[in-house]
Amino acid sequence: KGELIYFADQKNFPYGVKSKKELENIIKDTVNLLEEKFSPDFIIMASNTPTLLLDYSRISKKLAGIYPPLSDAGKISRTRNIAILGTRSVIQSESVTEFIEKCNVPNDIVIHKIDCSLLVELVESGKFLTDEEYCKNIIKEVLEDVFLDNLIDVATLSSTHLPFLEPFLRSIFKNVKFLDPAKNISNVLKDFVENNDLQQNVLRIFTSGDVNLFKKNLQMMGIDDEVNFLTI
């Protein structure tokens, strides 16, 4: 039996406006806490921001990150214009520029980096669960002009908050393909579970924020598991 620990670090949200040093300290403290309390075999850092900004292998060999699937985007774009949708700190960083240079993306592809911090906030606040019209208006405000002006037809959801908005995104931008970066790391985790004979999993959920509010939002998504408080 395997135990899956989900830790929502709401206390330190948003990661997207933190400095590199602040992020490094947060991730170090979080990993230390998780290792001391749970002794995990594998830790997924389910955020593109620290994945791209930090040399996380120096923090722990157990850590795995989530990266924008740019190679996949480049293969399917017909207009040769793709977008990275991410937090402000990622979009403005040299790290994402270096990552782009390392990716196997054809030379004729134009990559547009778009600050989607306002969209991340829609998810973190739970607004996406209660006010569809408001969320769609914010999405249009952030993305509509840049998508249309640049003929963008593929976008990577390079914040793990953004896939929660995918139904809205698809309904507004019917000719744009949105790629979820979590799918690649989920395959890695699946292989790990199968190779270690962990066929039945138990989910335990923790937050460093408001337990009752987080539980309420989870229930609205059909998740009725117990939520406990945990903080670094």
Predicted regions and their residues:
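Non-catalytic structural scaffold of enzyme domains
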Residues: 1-232
